[in-house]
Amino acid sequence: MAQTRGGALERAAAVPAETRERIEELKSKRDAVILAHYYVEPEVQAVADYVGDSFYLAKLAKTLPQQTIVLCGVEFMGESAKLLNRDKTVLLPEPAADCPMAHMVSRATIDGARAEYGDDLAAVSYTHLTLPTT
C-alpha cells in the first residue's frame, strides 16, 4: 500500500541536488521526517522519506523516532497525524490544501440524522473528515 523513497528515485532527477541536500540538512537539524501522500507532486514525493495513503502515513508517523512530522497532503491528513501523535510537532507545508471528500458531510447533517433516527445512530467514516465534522 505504501512505498519508501526508493519508489520515487526516478523522479529525483527533477529535484536539484543542492535542494535535496538542503532538505536533508534541515531534516537532520530539526529532527524531521517528510511524509507525502500519493497525490502530491512527483517532485515532493521524490524528496519524501515515505509515500503512501492518508491512514498509512498517520499510523506510520507514530512509529518513527523523529519529533517533527512534515506531512505533505491535505488538511485532514495533518489533523489525523496530530491526533495519533500528540507529543510530536506536525507541520502541513500547504495549509490551503483541501480534499472535497472531507466536506461531503457536515456536523449539521450528522446531528440531523441523529435527531431523526435517535442518539445511538453511529456515524461511520474513513479518515476523510475534518475535525469539526467528527
Predicted ranges, named:
Residues A2-L84, T89, P93-S125:
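Metallocofactor- and cofactor-centric catalytic cores in central/energy metabolism, strongly enriched
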